[in-house]
């Protein structure tokens, strides 16, 4: 995937009403491409968005869409999209964000790569533009808590931890267990939600201040070297974040 700040975006429509909704959205997203059945190409007349009007089956378009785009917004039924994309799935680190919008433009559902791929964030943006309701199911987004795997990504932070640590610590966070958040480096503007930080997240300025026996996990933002014995002592309870060395963030 390319830079999530400037994603390659495609709107896909296969029905009359879906094309109408896609055209409405495309007017607000001039950088988005459009992929539609040739039958409904005229719906997009007057728009400046690049348009691909195909004559065959939508299933033949999915592979190229997955290769070319970072976010794909389908104005297609959820079940159909699941069946169409299934043969093309690789991993959450490689797959594009996939979003589904119903033909009436009432609901926007992130289906694939909601967190790491940015589909959750884009679903909220699409919903806002359409006047629709975003339907998010990612636990940290629904619970308005820390997204362990992508925390600080907008600031250039790099996550340093085995995947099992990220999985275990994410579970502790979304289950509302006590979490120590230690920030020794990086920008203080890492919390971007409109809601307050959950009261289960306790902040510390130094790792040595943390009474480790009181916390299910530790999130540590630092430039310091983490000795192997510390990883071993905390087992799967530690995730480290590395802010850029040459910037305040």
Label each region the model flagged.
Residues 5-10:
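Extreme N-terminal starter segment of soluble prokaryotic enzymes
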Residues 60:
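Nucleic-acid-processing active sites and adjacent nucleic-acid-binding tracks
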Residues 12-42, 46, 52-57, 65, ...:
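Conserved mixed alpha/beta catalytic, RNA-binding, or beta-rich assembly cores of soluble enzyme
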């Amino acid at each position: 995937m390319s830079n999530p700040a400037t994603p390659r975006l495609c709107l896909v429509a296969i029905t009359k009403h879906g094309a109408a909704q896609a055209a409405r959205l495309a007017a607000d997203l001039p950088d988005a491409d459009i992929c539609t059945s040739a039958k409904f190409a005229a719906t997009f007349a007057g728009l400046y968005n690049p348009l691909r009007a195909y004559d065959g089956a939508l299933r033949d378009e999915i592979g190229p869409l997955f290769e070319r785009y970072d976010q794909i917004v389908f104005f297609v039924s959820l079940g159909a999209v699941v069946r169409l994309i299934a043969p093309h799935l690789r991993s959450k680190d490689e797959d594009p964000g996939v979003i589904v919008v119903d033909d009436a433009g009432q609901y926007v559902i992130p289906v694939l790569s909601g967190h790491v791929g940015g589909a959750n964030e884009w679903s909220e943006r699409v919903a806002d533009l359409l006047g629709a309701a975003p339907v998010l199911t990612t636990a940290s987004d629904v619970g308005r808590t820390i997204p362990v795997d992508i925390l600080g990504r907008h600031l250039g932070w790099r996550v340093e931890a085995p995947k099992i640590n990220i999985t275990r610590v994410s579970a502790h966070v979304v289950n509302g267990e006590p979490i120590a958040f230690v920030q020794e480096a990086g920008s203080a503007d890492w919390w971007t939600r409109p809601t307050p930080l959950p009261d289960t997240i306790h902040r510390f300025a130094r790792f040595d201040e943390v009474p480790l026996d009181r916390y299910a996990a530790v999130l540590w933002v630092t430039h310091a070297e983490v000795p192997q014995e510390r990883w071993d002592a905390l087992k799967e309870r530690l995730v480290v974040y590395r802010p850029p060395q040459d910037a305040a963030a």
